[in-house]
Amino acid sequence: MTQPQRPSIYFNVHLVSDSTGETLNAIQRAACAQFENVQPLEHNYYLVRSERQLERVMKEIEAAPGVVWYTISDGALRGRLEAFCRERSIPTLPVLDPSIAMLSRHLGVAPNNRVAGQHALDEDYFERMEAINFTLAHDDGQNVESLIGADVILLGVSRTSKTPTCVYLANRKVRAGNIPLVPGVPLPDFMEKMGDKGPLVVGLKISAERLVQIRRQRLISLNQDEITEYADEEAVRDEITQANRLFQRNGWKTIDVSRRSVEETAAGILNMLHERWGHS
């Protein structure tokens, strides 16, 4: 007899980095892949290098407790984050520390604790950082007046992984921006007039069932028990229908993210860009 499938376990994981977050994301996903039916709810914080930035991060952690994985070189910031989490019994893991400590013992040399020390300061690095800065400045509909300078613009309703997909693309030196599709809120005027010479526009599609599941888990993580229109199945279906009609009307390319990881979605977008740019 087939054993019934165990229900999925959802938990918050906060990834705090003073650099691009690429290392943290790779390690976290590799670790979670070792567990069946485990669904981490990722909260990503990139380029955290000041007290003010850390303050915002800690407020987010307090609002949705879970586990905290971090790569922060600054001793004062590390101390604040660790003390904050310790006072609230929130587990923390400085993911690079074991590897750095082992190398230090083996080589007999103290680490220099450079921020983003894993990145060589070469042309490739600066191109990546330029893309990351562009992406962070054009996240969630910000600075739309300069969004025309993007390589790709992602459109999608709330909770379709627009931001993490853009950050992943930025780590591949792609200038990515995203605009949330909100019922009743029009897109910037230039979006429907760009034609083939503007940025690649990709609509992120998702099934209503999957989106309802994600949004309800999001409400649970924020300790909100009431099912609002945000997670109501009928309202979600209407929202998705409007988005799909918009994509079709403008002839924009689409990717269904219902069961895709961020990496898979980004890979599909990179393929579209390579076709457009004439790369193999």
UniProtKB/Swiss-Prot annotation:
Residues that hold ADP according to the record:
G156, V157, S158, R159, T160, S161, K162, T163
Q: Which UniProt keywords apply?
A: Kinase, Nucleotide-binding, Serine/threonine-protein kinase, Transferase
Q: Which residues cross the membrane?
A: none
> Could you tell me one molecular function GO term of this UniProt entry?
phosphotransferase activity, phosphate group as acceptor
- Catalytic activity annotation: N(tele)-phospho-L-histidyl/L-threonyl-[pyruvate, phosphate dikinase] + ADP = N(tele)-phospho-L-histidyl/O-phospho-L-threonyl-[pyruvate, phosphate dikinase] + AMP + H(+); N(tele)-phospho-L-histidyl/O-phospho-L-threonyl-[pyruvate, phosphate dikinase] + phosphate + H(+) = N(tele)-phospho-L-histidyl/L-threonyl-[pyruvate, phosphate dikinase] + diphosphate
Q: Which Enzyme Commission numbers does its entry carry?
A: 2.7.11.32, 2.7.4.27
Q: Name one Pfam family in it.
A: Kinase-PPPase
Q: InterPro entries under this entry?
A: Kinase-pyrophosphorylase, PPDK_reg
Q: Name the family.
A: Belongs to the pyruvate, phosphate/water dikinase regulatory protein family. PDRP subfamily.
Q: What does this protein do?
A: Bifunctional serine/threonine kinase and phosphorylase involved in the regulation of the pyruvate, phosphate dikinase (PPDK) by catalyzing its phosphorylation/dephosphorylation.
* HAMAP family registered for this protein in UniProt: PDRP
Task: Kindly provide the name given to this protein in its UniProt entry.
Answer: Putative pyruvate, phosphate dikinase regulatory protein
